[in-house]
């Protein structure tokens, strides 16, 4: 009965979420044609908040004292599911866009919309020319006052734990001297897991950790920077997973108490 209820609830949540998305997106497309997307950022945030609500997610944001909301930066975030960008847009208190695979920009309508809104295409970085282009476009976004979201794992988690980080984003931040804000998405793995379309109502907590300077770092410091930021991001995620496993291992009578 529990599984049947989860199935029916998921169908309803997906239906309402997609219906709202399909109604709202044409409005954003029309506005993007005639207006700079910066002019209606509030509307985009409203869309993201409604997507979170209709999918069964309650967003809670926790800011560390050392997080500087006034500085343009790069947000390094763990990657859990397809809802991550929407949840982050609800919680990050500044204009923000993201790195996105260049192949996505070739998708009809969607690709144009992502380009128009200012996302940065990530090409095949084995090609030095493409790498320079990525560096240049990232620098232009930062100089224009747009913070960027990077998922350094390069893929979504399959088990809830934070995967190993790729080094590219950290090398870029070090070379450009852009500050990094580690951010943790906690609870998203319960909301929706990769490979399982079941949506579960839950609270998703976005931790915005202390802003970390990179301008005085050298190339040799990048591996240590990467390890440090992974540890910061993973800490609340691991604590949440540990609490969940402890609750599941408790006897039913104790859980109900």
Where are the regions a protein language model picked out?
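Non-catalytic C-terminal accessory region of glycerolipid acyltransferases
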Residues: 4, 132-257
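A hydrophobic membrane-anchoring feature enriched in long, contiguous, low-charge segments
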Residues: 4, 8-33
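Short gly/ser/thr-rich secondary-structure transition/capping motifs
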Residues: 55-62, 131-132, 188-190
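Catalytic core of membrane glycerolipid acyltransferases/transacylases, capturing the structured
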Residues: 24-45, 52-56, 63, 67-127
């Amino acid at each position: 009965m529990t599984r049947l209820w989860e199935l029916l609830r998921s169908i309803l949540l997906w239906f309402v979420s997609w219906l709202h998305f399909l109604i709202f997106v044409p409005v954003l497309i029309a506005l993007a044609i005639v207006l700079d997307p910066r002019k209606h950022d509030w509307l985009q945030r409203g869309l993201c908040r409604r997507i979170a609500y209709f999918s069964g997610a309650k967003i809670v944001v926790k800011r560390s004292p050392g997080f500087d909301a006034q500085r343009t930066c790069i947000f390094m975030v763990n990657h859990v599911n397809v809802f991550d960008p929407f949840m982050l847009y609800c919680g990050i208190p500044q204009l923000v866009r993201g790195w996105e695979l260049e192949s996505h920009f070739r998708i009809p309508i969607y690709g144009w919309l992502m380009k128009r809104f200012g996302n940065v295409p990530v090409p095949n970085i084995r090609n030095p020319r493409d790498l320079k282009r990525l560096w240049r476009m990232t620098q232009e976004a930062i100089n224009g006052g747009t913070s960027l979201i990077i998922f350094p794992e390069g893929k979504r988690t399959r088990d809830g734990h934070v995967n190993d980080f790729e080094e590219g984003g950290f090398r870029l931040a070090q070379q450009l001297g852009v500050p990094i804000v580690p951010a943790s998405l906690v609870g998203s793995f319960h909301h929706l897991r990769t490979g399982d379309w079941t949506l579960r109502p839950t609270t998703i907590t976005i931790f915005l950790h202390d802003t970390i300077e990179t301008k005085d770092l050298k190339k040799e410091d990048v591996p240590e920077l990467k390890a440090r930021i992974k540890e910061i991001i993973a800490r609340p995620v691991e604590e949440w997973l540990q609490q969940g496993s402890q609750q599941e291992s408790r006897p039913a009578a104790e859980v109900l108490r």
